[in-house]
A protein has these predicted regions:
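RNA-binding accessory domains that recognize and position tRNA/RNA substrates
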Residues: 3-137
Length: 137
């Protein structure tokens, strides 16, 4: 993402990170709401952002990864260099929830029942004026 948006990415052969790392976070970011200033995260990378794209700021860093988390709140772009989806990142689920609910504005009220009811209404509406042939064995 950083490279595609005009930033620069370098190879960190000697500074690569694999395993647990303590990330220092700027907790003023919506993405990091309720997450501590220093958290353990699971890293697995050999490349890193060397120059941020215009409008971005660093919201997380380690001693060997100066841009472990970045954001451009104005454009709605957020990126992390670690793995929030794994158990080895204890606050990863909180970060994902923040992305969904704080950043993207998801509501969290979706249920399979609501989906089924909505699809039945849509189908009934489409079939109200249609001809239907439904052979059965």
């Amino acid at each position: 993402m950083a490279y595609t948006l005009g930033g620069k990415v370098g190879h960190a052969a000697e500074l690569s990170e694999y395993g647990k790392a303590k990330v220092a976070f700027d907790t003023t970011s919506k993405l990091l709401k309720g997450i501590g200033a220093n958290e353990i995260c699971w890293m697995s990378h050999t490349d890193y952002v060397t120059e941020l794209p215009e409008g971005f700021r660093i919201i997380g860093k380690t001693p060997t990864c100066p841009a472990a988390a970045i954001e451009c709140e104005a454009k709605g772009f957020y990126g992390v260099q670690f793995h929030p989806e794994v158990n080895h990142t204890p606050k990863g689920s909180a970060l994902i929830k923040n992305f969904l609910f704080e950043v993207c504005g998801c509501k969290g009220d979706w249920t399979m029942t609501n989906y089924i009811e909505d699809q039945i209404k849509k189908s009934a509406s489409r079939l109200a004026t249609a001809r239907l042939c439904a052979p059965s064995p």
